[in-house]
């Protein structure tokens, strides 16, 4: 007997000799043989199903290609975003993520209480794979259903490949519930992103990139210092023209950050096109798109080096390029983008009915002079929480009253019937505020530390570090002038 598997269907084929052999058997006995055979091929335990990654009707485009060799990787991430939840741990091959060995329900990766259990599960899988590799080398028969399940993931049956997979076991949590929340935020911020992309002349489907970067969370921070919906690093922000100082961090503003991301992606395509044409003069935009998207994670220079070494063939780079930083997150970035694009475009299929956030609407007034947040609240009669939701670029030094909103800032206000003209005129008629917006300063002396200075002025060390952008190590130097934040009253 043999199997023909096409489009998710399993058809039992019987050879001519087997047919004549079975023809004389009682029908019940024939069906018993079939059931036993199917049970051997498809064990009932979900953790050992024939293939734990589902097939999806993935529709790509000429601009965003997904070659057949990349599709299994994309389908894995579709399941991460649209099928498995944050309480599921998926044990898989880091180099071939679609090679899923086991799904553990209720045991998310990265949770301290789950560490020992997941570690033991990985150990068992590793031992099983190593045993299978040894059995192949010794030309021993592999008859156990669970062993055959693992073996079927390696069509070439290469012991070295199997052992490599055993060394590359990785735990990936699902994110279906997180993606549902991202879709709600997408309803709020998606229109802003689409407008920016249109004005910048970029493809509209780039709107799905923040799903991968931050789950469309404009308040997201990473462990390495990236911030906002587009996860922009501080140094990159400044090169993209974003304000980043004690009063403003435009990485947290969806519109400003989207313009920054658009500038980055346009520059990336321009620079990578030059690099690619040096290797392949007739390279197409479609061929470059995976490199441009991946550069958002890995950097333009990193992608340029990969192209110069191996040429503008993305699959070749994916499989053969080797550096310390070209690892799991980078290799899966484009596939993750395609997966997020597919899940978001087919959200009804994956999530059914869900609540969508309302598009962000606001009026804007350009401040002619610096002004405190207290005065803004008083003049316009708007709560601080409402103002904060519309003006996320303003830092906590502004919200705490330590610094004024700078002149020239485009202040966003909630829409109002009849507009805000009378309130704006009143604001502009008021005299300057005294004693605000100019914190104390201190000149660093020998032996000082940031936290010792903060203690002397009875302010939080973290506030002093953040206000002066001292970085994670809080390095200061003799003669440096530091701004001292005001203390919060009460």
Protein language model features and the residues they cover:
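Short, surface-exposed glycine/acidic/tryptophan-bearing loops
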Residues: 220-241, 408
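Aromatic (phenylalanine/tyrosine) cluster motif
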Residues: 3, 19-20, 37, 42, ...
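Bacterial N-terminal signal peptides
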Residues: 28-40
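An acidic, Gly/Ser/Thr/Pro-rich helix-cap/linker signature
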Residues: 48-200
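Extracytoplasmic and endomembrane cell-envelope/extracellular-matrix remodeling and assembly machinery
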Residues: 145, 149-192, 199-200, 239, ...
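N-terminal secretory signal peptides that target proteins for export/translocation
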Residues: 1-24
